[in-house]
Amino acid sequence: MSGNPDAFENDPGFPFLGMSREAKAASAARPFDSKKNCWIPDPEDGFVAAEIQSTTGDQVTVVTVKGNQITVKKDQCQEMNPPKFDKTEDMANLTFLNEASVLGNLKDRYKDLMIYTYSGLFCVVINPYKRLPIYSESVIKHFMGKRRNEMPPHLFAVSDEAYRNMVQDKENQSMLITGESGAGKTENTKKVISYFAIVGATQAAAGGKKEEGKKGGTLEEQIVQTNPVLEAFGNAKTVRNNNSSRFGKFIRTHFSGSGKLAGGDIEHYLLEKSRVVRQAPGERCYHIFYQIMSGNDASLRGKLKLNNDITYYHFCSQAELTIEGMDDKEEMRLTQEAFDIMGFEDQETMDLYRSTAGIMHMGEMKFKQRPREEQAEPDGEEDALNAAAMLGINAEEFLKALTKPRVRVGTEWVNKGQNLEQVSWAVSGLAKAIYARMFKWIINRCNKTLDAKEIERKHFIGVLDIAGFEIFDLNSFEQLWINFVNERLQQFFNHHMFVLEQEEYKREGIAWTFIDFGLDLQACIELIEKPLGIISILDEECIVPKATDMTYAQKLLDQHLGKHPNFQKPKPPKGKQGDAHFAIVHYAGTVRYNANNFLEKNKDPLNDTAVALLKHSVDNNLMLDIWQDYQTQEEAAEAAKAGQSGGGKRGKSSSFATVSMIYRESLNNLMNMLYQTHPHFIRCIIPNEKKASGVIDSALVLNQLTCNGVLEGIRICRKGFPNRMLYPDFKHRYAILAADAAKDSDPKKASVGILDKIANDGNLTDEEFKIGETKIFFKAGVLAKLEDLRDEILSRIVTMFQSRIRSYLAKAEVRRRYEQQTGLLIVQRNVRAWCTLRTWEWFKLFGKVKPMLKAGKEQEAMGELAEKIQKLEEAVQRGEIARSQLETQVADLVEEKNALFLSLETEKANLADAEERNEKLNQLKATLESKLTDITGQLEDMQERHEDLTRQKKKTEQELSDTKKHVQDLELTLRKAEQEKQSRDHQIRSLQDEMANQDESVAKLNKEKKHQEESNRKLNEDLQSEEDKVNHLEKIRNKLEQQMDELEETIDREKRSRSDIEKSKRKVEGDLKVAQENIDEITKQKQDVENTLKRKEDDLHHASTKLAEEQALAAKLQRQIKELQARIAELEEELESERNSRQKADRTRNELQRELEEISERLEQQGGFSAAQLEANKKREAEIAKLRREKEEDALNHETAVSSLRKRQVDAVAELTEQLETLQKLKAKGDAERAKLQRDLEEAQHATDSEVRARQEVEKSYKTIEVQFSELQTKADEQSRQLQDFAALKNRLNNENGDLNRTLEEMDNQVNSLHRLKSTLQSQLDETRRNFEEESRERQALAATAKNLEHENEILREHLDEEAESKADLTRQISKLNAEIQQWKARFDSEGLNKLEEIEAAKKALQLKVQELSDTNEGLFAKIASQEKVRHKLMQDLDDAQSDVEKAAAQVAYYEKHRRQFEKIVEEWKKKTDDLASELDAAQRDNRQLSTDLFKAKTANDELAEYLDSTRRENKSLAQEVKDLTDQLGEGGRSVAELQKIVRRLEVEKEELQKALDEAEAALEAEEAKVLRAQIEVSQIRSEIEKRIQEKEEEFENTRRNHQRALESMQATLEAETKQKEEALRIKKKLESDINDLEIALDHANRANADAQKTIKKYMETVRELQVQIEEEQRQKDELREQFLASEKRNGILQAEKDELAQQAEAAERARRNAEADCIELREQNNDLSNQVSSLTGWRRKLEGELLAVHAELEELVTELKNAQEQGQKASADAARLAEELRQEQEHSMHIERIRKGLELQIKEMQIRLDDAENAALKGGKKIIAQLEARIRAIEQELDGEQRRHQDTEKNWRKAERRVKEVEFQVIEEKKNEERLTELVDKLQTKLKIFKRQVEEAEEVAASNLNKYKVLQAQFEQADERAEIAENALSKMRNKIRASASVIPPDGFPLAQSPSSALVRSASNARFL
């Protein structure tokens, strides 16, 4: 940086761009020994600096900077550059060029965040991962128009060089910003575009014209605002980059011939369409989706029908939803603002949003497969309706187009059914196509806006930003194309830097040895794009029938594996890597590619039927525009029928335009464009993978430097000649360096002469330049040296020219004064003579006669002069006309010359190309001639063979013709066979499907037939057996009559119980489902938790046994806190005494100040002072000096007191640290005890292994829960990251509370670990319960209870997690407040010299905070103790559950014993955590109180700052006054001049005051958002302004009235004032240092205030979230109410059913009276049936047999028997259903509904059959009654089970009600918090209004004072004018006196004969006449 301007070093961005002079000097002074200092390899840092100690052979012993002594080989050591090259700005200047030096230089610069470094001809930039102040407008102005060597490395320097090259060379430029993904390409692109926009606008402004954009803003604003639009729709989050450009863009900024901005355009490449529908883990979809959902526009989501949360929409919620550090709401606002500036219409913007929302709705469209059909159908139409509404099409037609698209079969169009997979692909493909075409439309729309047609476009500068090289765990089709494009760009760089450069040297005839840098990438490029390459084979596979991704991968392996060095077989995946099918060796590394979906992505098929709908969209014009150029197959067919030439093209050939073809064409166009421009390269580097600022991963950076060719670029830049100029250009620019040599007309000879002259002068050497055929070549930096020489000569010439002009002007002024002097002397002499002769009579006569003698002559002379003037004017006009004609001719000739020059240059370039081609042709000719000789010899041999072959040919030709015919026939046959094969395959598939369906039908029929045959056989056997039992039926009837009454009662009870059960089952179903899911999840987690248990169980036991010790320790800490509070009280008293002393000193100072002002007034009022008065003044000044010394001593004492306070505080912190160590020891003891518990758990684990094996089949169904578990795991990871953030924030707590907070955090971590342990243990117990559910109904009921408890625990755990998060937020806020307290304490310490009364208030506020934090800690520990009570309650509940389990089985009791031990501890900690959650509310209230106190402390410190500022201004004013008075005394008696100086001084002071007022007003406007301290600033500024203006007004009056007397009196006190001046200067310096400290503290306060504002915003977000939760709870309550109403309806239905059953009972009663005779026998039969009830299945079979026998014997009672059989079957089904409900609770409600319907049908049938039975035999009725009685007994058993379950359901309901009440209580508390925040906001707004009024009052006061001052200033100006008039009069009077004394009156007639005297005489004569 040879010419860095001094002004730039003061810019805030300079430290991040270059080194200061002092830093360079310090670096250069570092000791260095070139023979000893070196670099050696290091595994961590790449290379490390070392010093050679000794050398032995080829071994070198070195000592590294780390202090390690290492022996390495000599060839491993690399040279180190001298210290003067430290942090060098251009690595091409390094003395030793090696990897170690380059890496070391980049690391040193990056450590200071100097991210830009030149590397020869290009610039290297390292991503800083933070915002730097190096892109501001001030930095742009510094770089604008500067040469590269004048400024430090910067992107702007390269941009300005490109701009100057474009303007000077009239050549298009390009800037290639390349690098890997995440290296910062997009950000640098935005900065480059902004720079060109500003430069172009500045050029336009310099030309007097500013180009306005078409609609929304200026053209430069529109160019800049394209970035937000493109980023919103084209950027997304990837694993390596939060704002990765997922498309490439080439932005061309056009300029006019004069460099004015003339518009721009954009071309895009490789948009990643697949991201719209799929995102990998850790990534996100395009930003626009999340911006729309951010809620920036409250009404927008409603218009777009996006009423659900973002997680509902599958297309954009597959991975990440937010980005750290990015506010989607703010980004949405910027995007909308960019749309407005770009001139987008509102309808256009809304269509974009609607289309985007339509894609989101398309992702939620559900389809399902029809049973036994290859046809998909819609599964719900809500999302389809929304999508169609957004796209402007009909929903029904849209769904039909997706499920049954129209296809062409022969010559007809039919609807083809699609299966589920095909429909899903069609939806995804259509969504991708819509988004891609929409993005293309946005590009075209931006180009339309940027097209400034009124300005002619001459040249452009293009900026290329394309996706960087990507190597992911899973690389697909998109990564292949991105990496291929980067491969082409790297090849372009290598070709431009290394090949073209050296070829041009050879063309120009320069002696040069070709260097092969080994960077040719052509092999990899040909592997991908050449015929039979990867892309070619892919396109071929896309048109091959039945081709798949696997066949494509296999073809690649067969074609290239082992045959091409860049193609490899992929290695097995490691870690998270996905499967791969092939690998390619790129320049940046080997990439493994997965070939899945390659063919589908390359073909990118679309559903033509759906596209046809979109082409006719109704109310979305965007759809019409983007699909306008798309031609469907139907449209192509119609066009072909109509005879249009392009009709069939779309349907056939264009369908094979694959994505690869389109990409390849656009890439070739891009490369052609780049080859036609002059490129500038920006290489972006990723410093590390962790996105950490200031950290360099040496291996990663070295790999990128090697791949990018950085070292090779530096080498060729140093060895070669990177700069060159044509001979005419060189002569034109540098002729001034050798004017004589440049006179030659031949540009080449003139240029050589100029260079010889420069070389002879010693400014250049022959090695620094070379003479070519058409150009001169220079080494790097030579042109800069020539520019410096040129500037130096121009400076000398301009200086000499200026001196000549000044000399001429001075001489002309001397001549003018000499002539003036001569004329004045003559006039004076004539006047004196006239005064003497005016009374002489002859002179009077002469005066009368003289005019008459010369009047005629004068008239003639005047006439001649008029004629001459007229002739001269005509001649002048003719000359002007001729000159204008000549100027026109000259301009035409200049234009012709320029045109000829350009054509000459073009011809020269063409000539050079022709010569190059000629040379290549000559070489080719020589090669061909050598080949020709070889071929001639071969030809002779071949002729001989030809004769032999000719004979054979004739014989073979006949055979060949026959074979050809045969082959043609075979081909024709083969084609026909192929067509028939395809049609038959289709028919076979359809027939196979039909056969499969028919086979299924046949199988079913056979099965039914067998079943019927078996039933018939059984019926025949049962009929025979039942004939013997008919006699016994009458006996059973009598027994049934007695049981009929019981039946009626049982039915009533059953109906009531069923209604209750139906009501409760809906409620229980949700809990059961959640419990089942939790059980499944816990089972899946079991294996993972087993290892965790081994580490965590010791903590559990330790926590239970050591809780009492921790509570005792907490009490001890509380006592110590109280002791610290007592110490603080003592310190408070000491501060009070210090404050009193400070107040006393201030009062003394104020009194002395007033005395000093009174003395000054007396001095000005009195004319002089006596010696006694002067002596008194000296004494007073001595007293003032003494008081100042005392004041300084007081300040020192105060600092001593503050230091003692700090020391005491440090001691207290040390004690707390010791206590923390004690806690850690206790924790270690607990770890030992936990090991014992682990052994017990292992024994229990062995017992459960057998049960685990039995549940393996059940675990298969748990696979569906894995996704949920992964989500929970993700949440756990997020919580872990939150804990890490919490730990990082906790480290910033002050020393007073840090240890206590860490203790609380450890306890929280233990609580969390115990909860996780509890959940694990609970899962084991639940698994044990589920194993015994099948053994006993009681155990099943108990398991259901346990599931409910587990559900409750899960809800409580979620509540605990939410409260833990809120607690973490609160803790972070407390840490921020504590950090702010520390800052204010620091300011308190540094501002001890000012206002101790405000410090007193700040100290009290700090003490209050400490007291409140102590109380908070006491509350925490007290609430921990209170958790014990809740623990006992839960233990009792668990004991009850345990007793139930013990009744079930002894084995269950064994497991329950261990469970109780674990659950006691877990539930204890759970309740403790719940209390901690409630405690958070109190902590939040404490936090608000702390915030209030902090604001008070800020106010006090702001007052201190204002007071210091006023003191500084007073001291500055006094010092200036002393200086002015001293200067006045030194100048003596020049009183008037002194008055003027005083006036000017007062004006300066007035300007300072005005400036201070303006600054205060600006500060008030800027700090309106910081309302908490604005009031103090405004009031202080207003009082200071009034005070200062009043003082100055008094000073003005006193000064104007008494300035003469003050000057005389101050002469005697000059020595005393001199001493006072020195003292004032010393105080001034001290105050200035204090002011700097206060300004730093003020910046801290501003940042703290901004953090507080962020906290307020966060609270507002919390309030909104709570409102959402309230709405969700209300919705749940409504659902419960609806369920209750539904249960009541079911109860009514069952009541009606009961009435029907009562009627049935009456009918049965009538049958009972008819069968009374056989009652005894029926009773016996009933006893037998009762014994059979124990086995439900056997009882059911027997009952069926009896019913069938009765049916065969008594045809009249068939109906009643069938009815009884159905009732028996129903009873069995009911029993089976109840058992099934215990295993599968989610199907329970469906069973109830089916049972209800079945009962209704059965009751109707039974009523009919009972009526028939009255007319039948009596024996049949007895049988029916017996069956009913059996069914009653079964129902009674079922009823008992249902009653037990009903009781459990009621318990769960009561628990749910308790949870609802808890939630309602939380909602009330959150509402209270919201009301408090609202009140706070209202107060802040009121204060803001007050502040604004105060500002307006201050402005009015300032304006009135300013008017007063202007009046005084006018009076002073009048006095100055009067003084000047008096001085002029006095000087004239003195001159008259001197003139009258020196002139002697003449005695005669001494008139001088001169023109002047003649003129005087003529005037005299005229007067005489």
From Swiss-Prot:
Q: Where in the cell is it found?
A: Cytoplasm, Myofibril; Cytoplasm, Myofibril, Sarcomere, A band
Per the database record, which ranges form the Myosin N-terminal SH3-like domain? 33-82
Sorted alphabetically, which InterPro entries does this protein's record hold? Kinesin_motor_dom_sf, Myosin_head_motor_dom-like, Myosin_N, Myosin_S1_N, Myosin_tail, P-loop_NTPase, XRCC4-like_C
Ranges of residues in domain IQ: 794-823
Q: Give coiled-coil spans as residue ranges.
A: 853-1941
Determine if Hydrolase is one of this entry's keywords.
no
Looking up PROSITE patterns in the UniProt record yields: IQ, MYOSIN_MOTOR, SH3_LIKE
Q: GO terms for biological process?
A: locomotory behavior; muscle contraction; sarcomere organization
Which intervals hold domain Myosin motor?
86-791
Q: Where is the signal peptide?
A: none
Q: Which parts of this chain are annotated as the region Disordered?
A: 943-967, 993-1029, 1134-1153
Region (Actin-binding) residue spans: 667-689, 770-784
What's this protein's function? Essential for muscle contraction. Involved in ovulation likely by regulating the contraction of gonadal myoepithelial sheath cells.
Domain characteristics, as noted in the entry = The rodlike tail sequence is highly repetitive, showing cycles of a 28-residue repeat pattern composed of 4 heptapeptides, characteristic for alpha-helical coiled coils.
- What is known about its subunit structure? Muscle myosin is a hexameric protein that consists of 2 heavy chain subunits (MHC), 2 alkali light chain subunits (MLC) and 2 regulatory light chain subunits (MLC-2).
Name recorded for this polypeptide: Myosin-3
